[in-house]
Amino acid sequence: MAFEGLSEKLNNVFKKLKSRGKLTESDVKEAMREVRLALLEADVSYKVVKDFVKSVTERAVGEEVLASLTPAQQVIKIVNEELVSLMGNSNARINMASKPPTVIMMCGLQGSGKTTHAAKLAKLLKKEGHRPLLAACDIYRPAAINQLQVVGGKADVKVFEMGQTDPVVIAKKALAYAKDYGHDILIIDTAGRLHIDEALMDELVNIKKETNPDEIMLVVDAMTGQDAVNVAKAFDDAVGITGVLMSKLDSDTRGGAATGFFRFLRYFWVGNVITHSCYKTPSKTAVAFEVIREKAAVTFSFFP
């Protein structure tokens, strides 16, 4: 599970601090050097780590902290608070249109799990009482339409497809179909690429213009580490993403890349089976508790 390695290393640092009793400024700075290394090894970006350690150090070396009866606990508390601040604001709820259908455009690189996550999201929304429609707008990848039909079938959600027609036309027709047949949510599965290119972005921009999506969800592979942050930035610059769905996060024990776009993070699923996978919504406080288990009075899950 994500953050396991980071959690273990940070807690080792805190155990050392607690064993010393009274702390000096030198003790705190040495601990922060170890924290810095642990964060970098967990795939947190260099700039984020630098700013984080600077903020913690400035607060932790103050006379009030070092002179307290429990200085180590004070330092742990400061690290926890700075972690929560680092995560920023996250809104896990879908922005629903005031007048249906709500349009959700899915985007991402090929192999990120975009099509599967489109079906998982559709199943989740159907379970919540909605009537979603999946639109097959990936006409390039072999068997992409068939894959969406298969996963859509497992989610018990209808799939709108027009074969190898222009994806922009398909998206526009799917929106009209959703309106005509009472689907209150349209999820558009767009084409991915092996890497970001101009043609991919132009197509997404044109689909966005035609459908005016309420949400633009980027699916990123957590296993790609900091590359996931770079991918998120590229898509955000091009089309303005409103949310991120992370795939394979339960396979990565580092998890630090998530800090780069936590404010966008909406859902994370455990397992690949459409009918049995478990979804989670993000909580920045829960992440901080998971990373710093020393401070937690009870056991917290990564995403409660």
Task: Please state what every model-predicted region is.
Residues 142-145, 196-197:
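Conserved D-loop-proximal element of ABC-family nucleotide-binding domains
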Residues 6-137, 144-164, 170-180, 184-190:
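Primarily NTPase-proximal linker/entry elements flanking Walker-type ATP/GTP-binding cores
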Residues 139-141, 192, 224:
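Short, glycine/acidic-enriched loop or turn micro-motifs at the edges of active sites
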Residues 80-93, 181-187, 193-195, 253, ...:
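C-terminal-of-GTPase-core extension/linker across diverse P-loop GTPases
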Residues 298-299:
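Short linear/disordered segments characteristic of secreted peptide precursors
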Residues 166-180, 195-283:
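Conserved catalytic-core segment of NTP-binding enzymes
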